[in-house]
A protein has these predicted regions:
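Nucleic-acid endonuclease domains
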Residues: 1-85, 89, 98-309
């Protein structure tokens, strides 16, 4: 039943992959689970960390466990708890394996003769992949480590039934900003100042709650953004508005202005100018005036008040 050619995915793995694509058609659930697992390990609110290189080797070993936990939670209904392995899919035990390196899964002897869900995420290059494989001796390397764990050989990878390869990982904004920009943000002593700088220098970039928590490193980090004394108040005289995805009207404003529309739990800042008229494209009416995205040539003017619905 389990005689599998080492270079060909078996039918069960192919079915797993197809069923998961049916359950999560665009991979949105899986990619969000991987994003949450990475952010959990960074623990930015307490530590200010935002990359795997900043995490100790001991803490990094827990990343695979966090991936398993978040995938189990996110894919409930597609997977359930396994009897001998991490997951059960269609009554079949499946081991969950994550690797920080591209094809670096370490397979223990007890997984041989079982199925595995293999995953990888690269926060720097913003991609992830996930697939299923029936683990046989034929697909594994001959040598093992001290724990007798082996990796999947280059040829053996052809036995993987991929759900997604090179799929885009949700952006880690602090990783993609220039280092000097991040240094400017983190150079401020107080969380409120760091949040102000974040929205000042990272305009037209999606900022998630996790990024805000990492930069603020304070318990009530969202308070540092609000209009009653937070970044919205501080940056308004500089002509900068902060649009939140939690508000339908603010999402519409972003769309009309022609900038990236924030989703729920996301924000985006942009400097605006009232130097426009009804013929100007991408203008929005706020506080009885028309506004558009400002250019470097536009003078600074006080930003309008935003609707909070």
């Amino acid at each position: 039943m389990h005689s599998v050619h080492p270079l060909t995915p078996d039918n069960v793995s192919i079915n797993f992959a197809q069923h998961l694509r049916n359950f999560d058609p665009d991979g949105e659930k899986c990619r969000k689970a991987l994003r949450k697992a990475l952010d959990h390990i960074y623990d930015g609110q307490r530590t200010g960390r935002f990359s795997i290189d900043q995490v100790s080797k001991t803490e990094a070993t827990h990343l695979g466990t966090m991936v398993e936990i978040y995938l189990r939670r996110t894919l409930d209904g597609f997977v359930s708890d396994g009897e001998r392995m991490d997951f059960s899919i269609d009554g079949i035990d499946v081991d969950c394996k994550f690797s920080k390196t591209r094809f670096g899964w370490m397979i223990p002897t007890e997984t041989v003769g079982n199925y595995a869900m293999v995953t990888h995420a690269n926060d720097y290059e913003r991609y992830w992949h996930l697939g299923f494989v029936y683990v046989t001796e034929e697909i594994l390397t001959k040598g093992g480590n001290r724990d007798r764990k082996r990796s999947i050989s280059k040829q053996g990878r052809q036995a993987i039934a991929w759900c997604w390869q090179e799929h885009t990982l949700p952006e880690n904004t602090l990783l993609t900003l220039p280092k000097e920009t991040v240094s400017l943000i983190t150079s401020h002593r107080h969380g409120t100042q760091r949040i102000n700088e974040l929205f000042r220098v990272a305009q037209q970039r999606i900022i998630t709650r996790n990024v805000i928590a990492t930069v603020a490193q304070q318990a009530d980090y969202m308070k540092r953004v609000r209009a009653n004394g937070g970044a919205r108040t501080t940056l308004a005289p500089e002509g900068i508005i902060i649009l939140g995805g939690d508000y339908l009207e603010q999402r519409k404003i972003a769309q009309v202005l022609g900038i990236t529309v924030p989703n729920k739990g996301e924000m985006i800042s942009v400097r605006v100018s009232s130097n426009c008229d009804s013929q100007t494209p991408n203008t929005v009416s706020l506080a009885a005036k028309l506004w558009r995205v400002a250019t470097d040539a536009d003078p600074i003017e006080h930003a309008p008040t935003l609707p909070t619905t």
